Amino acid sequence: MITSVNLQDVKDKLYLDLKDTGWDDKLKSFLQGTEMDKILEILLKEAMDGKRFTPPVKYIFRALKSCHFNKTRVVIIGQDPYPQIDVADGLAFSCSRQDRTEVSLQYMQKCIMDTVPQEDRAPVQSNDLSRWADQGILLLNTAFTTSIGKPGTHQILWRNMMVNILDALVWNSDPLVYVFLGKKAQ
């Protein structure tokens, strides 16, 4: 059980996780501000009340850590993390479980197979999409967390963080391709 947590320590850790990704400078004021305090307080309260959320804290900003700001070429935005235990891994549509492919990922894979010529596509080798992130595809959800078994519960919580991220991307000098998947993401 969680007994004592210093929010500033958590904020500092999350900020340091983004060091050298280009996101640290773009999001510094948000990450070090009072809004991030509120987000962390809500997540901490849920944890202390015995409620679980996903993905695990160490993966909350994995999408940003995995795709350097200056190397981002495509932004794929989904709704929120898979709401099952041990499925969400911090990258939208990616899945830490290899024994079962989630329906939304199956749909994406089918769309790729149906629209991209075979000679132009790499084979899908796993449910982990970190290779996509390595290639400049930012795999974001509109919410970075959700309660276990309850999709959409943290949408409002992360809204301003997403606004900050999208603002930073829009004002990026390089043109980007945006793909919004799902009604909530659109």
Mark where each language-model region is.
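Class I S-adenosyl-L-methionine
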Residues: 1-16, 20, 167-170
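A polyanion-binding, active-site-adjacent surface
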Residues: 21-186
